[in-house]
């Protein structure tokens, strides 16, 4: 089985800065693999271990994907190779535009039997790209996948959790016409941490750059990005023990009008 895993690189949200004007500061913020795509990479690795190959596919800017560090991070998590689409002219914040770029890149990547995605991305979490990729490729798409089990002869048992039940589907990856696009949830597995040997091997795996497919103009434009307005929180330290501290607290609350 030939597996393509789509993964997005996003700014590390733990190091974002909120500027005085409430805009988000991205200067110096490192890039990382989207948390939900780590689950997709882990699922791909587990399936490929049973017999098959795995290719990672990522689309984004040169700033996000151009460093060898982030490329090695992706490759250390199981893929045999990495295909990149670098385009600094598009922010890829429109889910349909992103899906068109991914679908074109998947077709350019060659033969495949299964396409895996995360349910959403850590930064935008639209939860739309996977099903849109399936529609553009003319393939069945299943989202919120919580389990994938090989059933022999290229067939996969796919589970997804609905509100009151678990739905079980069969996906046949024997021929390209029966390929599928699966968007996995974070519940499907716990992503493993790459061992040192995996990191060392990652530097020797092939990285190929693909031309950006024609994905049209975005239907969404970002006008501004603002953090929630911060409210000043007042603090009062009440010292003392027992009744003395209680009396001081009551006096403070009365003074503040509570």
Regions found by a protein language model. Name each.
Residues 1-258:
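N-terminal glycine-rich FAD/FM-binding segment characteristic of electron-transfer flavoproteins
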